[in-house]
Curated annotation (Swiss-Prot):
Keywords: Chemotaxis, Cytoplasm, Hydrolase, Phosphoprotein. It catalyses: [protein]-L-glutamate 5-O-methyl ester + H2O = L-glutamyl-[protein] + methanol + H(+); L-glutaminyl-[protein] + H2O = L-glutamyl-[protein] + NH4(+). GO terms for molecular function: phosphorelay response regulator activity; protein-glutamate methylesterase activity; protein-glutamine glutaminase activity. Its EC number is 3.1.1.61, 3.5.1.44. Residues 5-122 form the Response regulatory domain. Gene3D superfamilies: 3.40.50.2300, Methylesterase CheB, C-terminal domain. Belongs to the CheB family. This is Protein-glutamate methylesterase/protein-glutamine glutaminase 2. Contains a C-terminal catalytic domain, and an N-terminal region which modulates catalytic activity. GO terms for cellular component: cytoplasm. Transmembrane segments: none annotated. Involved in chemotaxis. Part of a chemotaxis signal transduction system that modulates chemotaxis in response to various stimuli. Catalyzes the demethylation of specific methylglutamate residues introduced into the chemoreceptors (methyl-accepting chemotaxis proteins or MCP) by CheR. Also mediates the irreversible deamidation of specific glutamine residues to glutamic acid.
Amino acid sequence: MSKIKVLVVDDSAIVRKIFTEELSKYPDIEVVGSAPDPFVARDKIVHLKPDVITLDIEMPRMDGLTFLKKLMRHYPLPAIIVSSLTPKGGKLTLEAMDIGAVDAIAKPGSSYSVGDMSGQLVEKIRAASGARVVRKSTQEMFQPGSRLSIRSLAETSNKVIAIGASTGGTEALKNVLSRMPPDSPGILVVQHMPANFTTAFAERLNSLCQIGVKEAADNDSVTPGTALIAPGNYHMILRRSGARYYVQIKMGPMVHHQRPAVDVLFKSTAKYAGANAIGVILTGMGADGAAGLLEMKQMGAGTIAQNEKSCIVYGMPKEAVKIGAVDKIVHLDSIADEIVRMV
């Protein structure tokens, strides 16, 4: 089996050394080179032909975003963004996702060890090596589809929509949520993403959608017309008190090497919302969410999976389909319509 060839692009010699040493421990990965800036990276990409690059977002001579735009236009290949755990880093990372990056990881630091980073980075590289890279124009803007409507707020106030995504999910979620009508049932979202990145992600979605979108806080009510995004590094659990749905935000052990984990949300939704829920699993690597979606279906919830053609990585939906957890397999552009039909 051929190895996955990786090029590390980072202005920090320390980060280049750490990434090279850590990735070299895995027999299926070969670090074919490293580059301190985009100009060196450009030449190495042409000559070394890597399968995946890791790309620092903030570099001298040419910043990572500018380089990524050029890369996607002339030599598109899977890029994993490496960014600091800061609000600025989160916003830049989301811009990179818009341009065409397939995933992101936080730089190792005081609260995020090399060991934590290593395992996650390897999984992201493996997923990225098989990702479908979408070539985008630098002027391309996402255009929402037709505006949907739901019959009445009263009919939907006891419904809950739970959505899970990983690699490629930032763009997929933008597609789905921007098409949801303002009278949608309450929506809960788990996107595999580091802490601080989710704050910027929620703010960005809120500016694009008819519904309100916010990063979830402990004890937030689940209300019609609002989507709650699980904060990075915390699980989000649905609870119910009488007629009120609310979320619990807590640490807890990682599930499928993830926190937040989709399975944690889906299993709690199965327990507390039952047949009043709709579960949606979008593009992403691994199997997170499959077991939880099956529990939702067994409790009477409607379940939807993104189809292979429209996925960046057909991993999580594939696993859900494989175990019989899915009612409808739908192209990304039709998922919002399918949710409305199920409501």
